[in-house]
């Protein structure tokens, strides 16, 4: 087994097309895990092993790959850059100890890289920065370094400087050693020479080296004092300081190169070893109680502790069902019986594997720090804790965003229904941001997801991976309803039909809740007019009605119910009577509280060439967008806007037409906002028409 200090659990994340997957391929080639390089544009890369990934040239799922460099074991996760798949990035960050943030040398800090950077900050994942594609037209390393400061509020620590740029890019100067690494044009990563710094770069190298040392010695008071007195620190001391500053995110060591041309990658791998933390150098994962509150205990990273592991991904591939697991504490051996604390059920561990993209090596045991795959686990879902039967515990749960878009699907023939149900069951286990419901009125299967591409891929998987021929409906927006006015009201439920009857009277206030508060219930009943044992029934009755509003039947958001008084009967009152009273009270009062339709607003980030920015802004305005910011860069303009989701369908096609294929955009859910009356009327009419059409079937 590799000792814990030599583990590096790292993720590679960035914007679409910044070169994440190619960077991963080069890491695997250099570490000896693959022999023929696969290119993303050929649809051959090792970590993009779904058909849909290979065809579209994007990474959709996070593939976990193990490899070795200088006696250190890397568990590498290649994450998607497309915003519809940020749940994969979030899920990966949960189990990583460090990361490589890849930026394009010409495109710089692009929309999705900003989102992923924010997620990594929230997860407190230490990172190094790799500015890729320096061989591209318009590449500028120092401009991208400045962008990371200005756009991401990051503190990049420049570790290398490029030798040449664009077609003339030959290699890099390592500022610590003052050595130049120069590659030939063969594309073979080992074909480089170590030379002296080019004469025309000496002054620039000394300038940046001094800045590097000044930042590094801030991590050690004694070294800083010695440096101020004219004593230069040793390279070992500087590396120790850089490692400390990287772990605390005081700065981010920044490198550059060209993954595609195999230039500069070895220094990035050395940096992973030298600067990114081992599993026992990051804050331990907190343990929680059943409600999700922290208990004050932690999963201490040690093989000698009791088992604490997190299932962070479920995948069904050609080998069978795989559960990807990060072991935080303890050991896991083939044949062990472990407890799933989420279900309370035990499972026996069959086969365990180290993953190499879509290949695997079976192993007999694993321990704290490992990321492995277990074959054939039952009843395990993403976010479940796997632990020692004698020492049950729960790790901090994963929280996934609510879907904002849905489509109706149906099999083309009756025989496809069962096949579709089995396939969808597997897909839900694999992707927690993918939800499926059955429409009660029409009986249709409704797929819900994070965006158009997300659902496109799901439909594609159903058709090609599982062979289900589908009829696919138009995308539908996840509208919501709320109220705008307080109502004080009462309701009595009374039913007498021989013997004991039903009786429950409630007096209550319904008022608009705080934004994002969802459903809030409280009671201010004084005395015993409504006994305490019936309060949960009243709450349950109100809560059960939040799924269907009165305007168009959409779920209701941000409403507060306060039970103020009421009455009960010693014989006829029961929990069910008060629950029925609350349900009827909801229907009675919600219509009086001036209900309002809400629509999802998306945070849209568009990159446009300068020549087309007027057209782009005009188009966003026509889509009812509110422009929030405009930032001019060297290669174009970033436009940030809040736009209703209903106006964004098919936007990528329009943007490509307006910008001759050069525009890019990312989009993520921001908040719900009141619909204009004209839009609300149209939505209500569409719902009525849909229901009428379903009634005729």
UniProtKB/Swiss-Prot annotation:
Subcellular location: Cytoplasm
Statement: the UniProt record of this protein carries the keyword GTP-binding: yes
SUPFAM superfamilies, per database record: EF-G C-terminal domain-like, P-loop containing nucleoside triphosphate hydrolases, Ribosomal protein S5 domain 2-like, Translation proteins
Domain tr-type G: 5-280
PROSITE patterns per UniProt: G_TR_1, G_TR_2
A GO MF term: translation elongation factor activity
Main localization, broad class: cytoplasm
Keywords, in A-Z order: Cytoplasm, Elongation factor, GTP-binding, Nucleotide-binding, Protein biosynthesis
Residues that coordinate or bind GTP: 14-21, 78-82, 132-135
Domain of life: Bacteria
Gene Ontology BP term (one): ribosome disassembly
A single cellular component GO annotation: cytoplasm
Keyword Transmembrane carried by entry: no
InterPro entries (UniProt xref): EFG_II (IPR041095), EFG_III (IPR009022), EFG_III/V (IPR035647), EFG_IV (IPR047872), EFG_V (IPR035649), EFG_V-like (IPR000640), EFTu-like_2 (IPR004161), G_TR_CS (IPR031157)
Function: Catalyzes the GTP-dependent ribosomal translocation step during translation elongation. During this step, the ribosome changes from the pre-translocational (PRE) to the post-translocational (POST) state as the newly formed A-site-bound peptidyl-tRNA and P-site-bound deacylated tRNA move to the P and E sites, respectively. Catalyzes the coordinated movement of the two tRNA molecules, the mRNA and conformational changes in the ribosome.
Family indicated by similarity: Belongs to the TRAFAC class translation factor GTPase superfamily. Classic translation factor GTPase family. EF-G/EF-2 subfamily.
NCBIfam families with a match to the protein in the record: EF-G, PRK12740.1-5, small_GTP
Entry protein name: Elongation factor G 2
Organism of provenance: Shewanella sp. (strain MR-7)
Name of the gene this protein is made from: fusA2
């Amino acid at each position: 087994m590799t000792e814990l200090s030599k583990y590096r659990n790292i993720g590679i994340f960035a914007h679409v097309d910044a070169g994440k997957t190619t960077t991963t391929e080069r890491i695997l080639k250099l570490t000896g895990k693959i022999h023929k390089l696969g290119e993303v544009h050929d649809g051959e890369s090792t970590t993009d092993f779904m058909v849909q990934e290979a065809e579209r040239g994007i990474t959709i799922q996070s593939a976990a790959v193990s490899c070795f460099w200088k006696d250190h074991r890397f568990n590498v996760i290649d994450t998607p850059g497309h915003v519809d798949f940020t749940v994969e990035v979030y899920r990966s960050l949960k189990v990583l100890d460090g990361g490589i943030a890849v930026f394009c040398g010409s495109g710089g800090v692009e929309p999705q890289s900003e989102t992923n950077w924010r997620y990594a900050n929230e997860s407190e994942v230490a990172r190094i920065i790799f500015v890729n594609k320096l061989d591209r037209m318009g590449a500028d390393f120092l401009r991208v370094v400045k962008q990371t400061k200005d756009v991401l509020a990051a503190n990049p620590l420049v570790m290398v400087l490029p030798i040449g740029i664009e077609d003339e890019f030959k290699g890099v100067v390592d500022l610590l050693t003052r050595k130049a690494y120069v590659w030939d044009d063969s594309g073979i990563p080992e074909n480089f020479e170590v030379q002296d710094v080019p004469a025309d770069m000496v002054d620039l190298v000394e300038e940046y080296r001094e800045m590097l040392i000044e930042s590094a010695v801030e991590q050690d008071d004694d070294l800083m004092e010695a440096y101020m007195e004219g004593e230069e620190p040793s390279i070992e001391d500087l590396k120790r300081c850089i490692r400390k500053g990287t772990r605390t995110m005081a700065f981010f060591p920044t490198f550059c190169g060209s993954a595609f041309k195999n230039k500069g990658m070895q220094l990035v791998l050395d940096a992973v070893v030298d600067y990114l933390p081992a599993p026992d150098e990051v804050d331990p994962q907190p343990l929680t109680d059943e409600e999700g509150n922290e208990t004050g205990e932690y999963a201490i990273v040690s093989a000698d502790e009791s088992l604490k592991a997190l299932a962070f991904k479920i995948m069904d591939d050609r080998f069978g069902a795989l559960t990807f697991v990060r072991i935080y504490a303890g050991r896991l051996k083939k044949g062990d019986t472990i407890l799933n604390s989420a279900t309370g059920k035990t499972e026996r561990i069959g086969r365990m594997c180290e993953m190499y993209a879509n290949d695997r090596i079976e192993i007999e045991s694993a321990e704290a720090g490992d990321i492995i795959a277990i074959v054939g686990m039952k009843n395990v879902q993403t976010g479940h804790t796997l632990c020692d039967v004698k020492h049950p515990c729960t790790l901090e749960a994963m929280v996934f965003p609510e879907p904002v878009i849905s489509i109706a699907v149906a099999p083309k023939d009756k025989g496809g229904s069962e096949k579709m149900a089995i396939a969808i069951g597997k897909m839900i286990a694999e992707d927690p941001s993918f939800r499926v419901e059955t429409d009660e009125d029409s009986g249709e299967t409704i797929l819900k997801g994070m965006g158009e591409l997300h659902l496109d891929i799901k439909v594609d998987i159903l058709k090609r991976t599982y062979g289900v021929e589908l009829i696919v409906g138009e995308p539908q927006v996840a509208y919501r309803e709320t109220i705008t006015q307080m109502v004080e009201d009462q309701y009595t439920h009374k039913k007498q039909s021989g013997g004991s009857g039903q009786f429950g009277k409630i007096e209550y206030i319904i008022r608009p809740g705080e934004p994002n508060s969802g459903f809030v219930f409280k009671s201010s009943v004084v005395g015993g007019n409504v006994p305490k044992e019936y309060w949960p029934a009243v709450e349950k009755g109100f809560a059960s009605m939040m799924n269907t509003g009165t305007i168009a039947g959409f779920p209701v958001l941000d409403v507060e119910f306060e039970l103020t008084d009421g009455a009960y009967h010693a014989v006829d009152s029961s929990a069910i009577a008060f629950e029925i009273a609350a349900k009827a009270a909801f229907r009675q009062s919600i219509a009086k509280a001036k209900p309002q339709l809400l629509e999802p607003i998306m945070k849209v980030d568009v990159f446009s060439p300068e020549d087309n920015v007027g057209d782009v802004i005009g188009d966003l305005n026509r889509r009812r967008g509110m422009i929030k910011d405009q930032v001019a860069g060297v290669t174009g303009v970033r436009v940030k806007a809040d736009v209703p989701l209903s106006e964004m369908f098919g936007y990528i096609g329009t943007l490509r037409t307006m910008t001759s294929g050069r525009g890019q955009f990312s989009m993520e859910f921001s908040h719900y906002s009141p619909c204009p009356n004209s839009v609300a009327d149209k939505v209500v009419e569409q719902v009525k028409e849909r229901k009428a059409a379903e009634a005729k079937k």
